[in-house]
């Protein structure tokens, strides 16, 4: 598991009250992990702070699964 993957899963776990080791990469934040729209906004802010990146609103709409968050952060960190 990459450092980015671990950090994304940890942020998701903290935000949604889950255990990081139980979070699967293919899990949908809303459908599988029970997140609501406010949780998603807070997750995006958490990713921005944790990785020191900026995620525009139009991009945040594409971050719907754990894997899409990992892929997005990886791309932004280049």
From Swiss-Prot:
Q: Which UniProt keywords apply?
A: Cytoplasm, Fatty acid biosynthesis, Fatty acid metabolism, Lipid biosynthesis, Lipid metabolism, Phosphopantetheine, Phosphoprotein
Subcellular localization is given as:
Cytoplasm
Q: Which SUPFAM superfamilies does the annotation name?
A: ACP-like
Pathway assigned to this chain's UniProt record: Lipid metabolism; fatty acid biosynthesis
Annotated GO molecular function terms are: acyl binding; acyl carrier activity
Q: How is it modified after translation?
A: 4'-phosphopantetheine is transferred from CoA to a specific serine of apo-ACP by AcpS. This modification is essential for activity because fatty acids are bound in thioester linkage to the sulfhydryl of the prosthetic group.
Please list the residue ranges annotated as the Carrier domain: 2-77
Q: List O-(pantetheine 4'-phosphoryl)serine occurrences by residue.
A: 37
Q: Which Pfam families match?
A: PP-binding
Nucleotide-binding as a keyword of this entry, yes or no, is no
The organism sits in which domain of life? Bacteria
Cellular component (GO) terms are: cytosol; membrane
BP terms from Gene Ontology? lipid A biosynthetic process
Its biological purpose is as follows: Carrier of the growing fatty acid chain in fatty acid biosynthesis.
The family note in this entry says: Belongs to the acyl carrier protein (ACP) family.
The record's annotation in NCBIfam families points to: acyl_carrier, PRK00982.1-2, PRK00982.1-3, PRK00982.1-4, PRK00982.1-5
**Under which name does UniProt file this protein?**
Acyl carrier protein
Organism for this UniProt entry: Acinetobacter baumannii (strain AB307-0294)
Q: What is the phylogenetic placement of the source species in the record? A: Bacteria, Pseudomonadati, Pseudomonadota, Gammaproteobacteria, Moraxellales
């Amino acid at each position: 598991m990459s450092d980015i993957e671990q950090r994304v899963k940890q942020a998701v776990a903290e935000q949604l009250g889950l255990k990081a080791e139980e979070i699967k990469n293919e899990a949908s934040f809303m459908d599988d992990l029970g997140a609501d729209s406010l949780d998603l906004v807070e997750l995006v802010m958490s990713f921005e702070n944790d990785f020191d990146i900026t995620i525009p609103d139009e991009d945040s709409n594409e971050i719907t699964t754990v894997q899409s968050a990992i892929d997005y952060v990886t791309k932004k960190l280049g």
